[in-house]
Amino acid sequence: MIEDFHLTPLSANADAADLLEALGPLDDSPAESQYCVFRSGRERFCLPVLDVEEVLDWPLLTKVPLAPPYLLGIFNLRGVIVPLIDIALTEGRRPGLLPKHVVVASLRGEAGHDDLRVGIAADEVIGTYSVTTEDLLEQAPENVPHCIGMLRHEDRLALLIDLRKLLEVYPGPSI
């Protein structure tokens, strides 16, 4: 509300220390980050929302000959070819059961390089959530090399995906 807004006039020769003093004490509450939480197979995973480009319904896929089993195919996303991987394959997804959604994630390219996009098969997109750093656990199971931690969410844990590691573990086709 406008009543909550308070201006403190500063003199013309005020410096940075005067400005900080006028602002008052800084908020010491834990920093919050937003994550997209989704289920793939039996496990919940999450990505920072800044890494998620969009969530799609299941697209029309083109199979890639001689592709590894985790590479479900490629699809066209507004003129960009995106590989679609199934990270639940290692957990024994039931044969013939296709996921319903695709979480399209983007790994920002370094200077002079394009962004890398990858689609991750998701059975359910649970939502986006703001969490504090207290809700993040630094340890991930050692047998999940593409995860760098875990997020506490609704009394359950979601594995935090590192896109760089994910693309090392599940390399897509060279296009």
Q: Predicted segments — roles?
A:
Residues 1-175:
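An acidic, low-aromatic, low-complexity terminal/linker signal
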